Amino acid sequence: MAVLAPLIALVYSVPRLSRWLARPYCLLSALLSIAFLLVRKLPPICNGLPTQREDGNPCDFDWREVEILMFLSAIVMMKNRRSITVEQHVGNIFMFSKVANAILFFRLDIRMGLLYLTLCIVFLMTCKPPLYMGPEYIKYFNDKTIDEELERDKRVTWIVEFFANWSNDCQSFAPIYADLSLKYNCSGLNFGKVDVGRYTDVSTRYKVSTSPLTKQLPTLILFQGGKEVMRRPQIDKKGRAVSWTFSEENVIREFNLNELYQRAKKLSKGGDMSEEKPGNPTPTAVPDGENKKDK
């Protein structure tokens, strides 16, 4: 079962993964990830390259290059143990493959290493990771609307994600959060998002650090009666996030979503709150002047 479950998940994710991989960002990232393999293996490119092989074959890996590639495989396997989505697995492979490529190119020739490093920098500056653009029941806030919405109707329970576009963890969590909003959104239980990378005063006001060192992104906060009730991840005394996995199961369990949903449904039936049926996606509500691509 330990092997079967990931295989089933991979097969289930093939259509979505193929669309994700077909985007320019992923294609270019894959090309950079196999750059050294192409240079070392494809003649006439490999002809004349320096090598430490005893047979002097420049178009095959030497023992040190094999060691580096094996070490890369071990690192990827260790990092992927905490990955939730297939996109996270592929993203880890891309990232560590580029690091290994840079080491291999610098070892081969410092000029080739500098050229590869320049290409990676240009890629990072010009290509942005694909954002999740699927169906969701999520309202996007700005620095003004978040406080107004939380105070507008205190009977409504809000779960708000504080995110930043540059965070890979936030991008990986986006489809999971969208699925949760489709399953649990109703008139008494709403889902929201705010870009603290864009609205820095919001991050200060709600004490969500945007520093990569604190690992506080993404942060989920539960609001009831306009007040914060709980958040994940929790913060230790040094201001760093306590390790927490943003999986669908963890969010449902930690935030008691099933109980919150049933309570919100009873509230909507007993009061004058309009009923919304989760599972049927509607256009995402965003503040004036913003759209999901801005996120």
Swiss-Prot record:
CDD domains associated with the record: TMX2 (cd02962)
Ranges per topology, Extracellular: 49-102
Region Disordered, annotated ranges: 266-295
Residue(s) carrying Phosphoserine: 211, 243
Domain Thioredoxin stretches: 114-269
Keyword Membrane included in the entry's annotation: yes
Coiled coil stretches, renumbered: none
Record localization: Endoplasmic reticulum membrane; Mitochondrion membrane
A biological process from GO: brain development
Keywords: Disulfide bond, Endoplasmic reticulum, Membrane, Mitochondrion, Phosphoprotein, Signal, Transmembrane, Transmembrane helix
Recorded topology in the membrane: Single-pass type I membrane protein
Residue stretches spanning the membrane: 103-125
Cytoplasmic face of the membrane: 126-295
Lineage top rank: taxon: Eukaryota
Segment forming the signal sequence: 1-48
GO cellular component, one term: mitochondria-associated endoplasmic reticulum membrane contact site
An annotated Gene Ontology molecular function: identical protein binding
Domain notes: The thioredoxin domain lacks the 2 redox-active cysteines, suggesting that it lacks thioredoxin activity. The di-lysine motif confers endoplasmic reticulum localization for type I membrane proteins.
Protein name in the entry: Thioredoxin-related transmembrane protein 2
Organism field: Rattus norvegicus (Rat)
Gene from which the chain derives: Tmx2
